[in-house]
Amino acid sequence: MTKIVAAFPCMGKSHYAKENPDTTIDLESSLYMFSRKGFEHLSVEEFKGIREREPIKNGMVHYLKTILETCHTGQYDYVFIASFPNLLKSLAQLGKDVYVVIPYPSMRSQRIYSKRAIARGNRPQWVEAVIPWLHHSTAYPKELINKIHVVRVPACFYLKDVIDHQLI
């Protein structure tokens, strides 16, 4: 059965999917949510955080539909997705099991994930906007927390570690 896995940025979703293409796909949300017109020369990571990105009409609907269709094929063991609360809520309302992997909130996590983001090419503005979410214990509404599987992990973990340790 295909597992839907949302994970905090920089946990190795793309890397794991590239290393395990027969079992895993990473559905990068920015490819569904924003037009790349004028930004084709940028990597996906560089593209994140650009304020001038043009939203794609119904991008979230298309992204959700792609997630559901990909799971329905049964081709993959893991479908990696973004961790937007509204997306997770929609999947939970549709009765889908969703695993959300988040590092324990700490200054160590903040340092590690900031360093990972910069190393992979994320813009500083993106890092400044995302990293503080490590410390938000209320990032997801209580009613959503009861419908998803939240997996907290040490700062040093990547998704490979989570899967190898059978935490999802």
Regions found by a protein language model. Give the residues of each.
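Short, aromatic/basic amphipathic alpha-helical patches
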Residues: Y16-A17, K89-G95, R116, S137-L144, ...
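Conserved substrate/cofactor phosphate-moiety recognition/catalytic segment
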Residues: K18-T70, Y113
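Glycine-rich phosphate-binding P-loop
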Residues: T2-P21
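Conserved beta-strand scaffold positions in the cores of enzyme catalytic domains, especially
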Residues: D22-D26, D97-V100, I148-R152
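Loop/turn-to-beta-strand initiation segments
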Residues: G74-F80
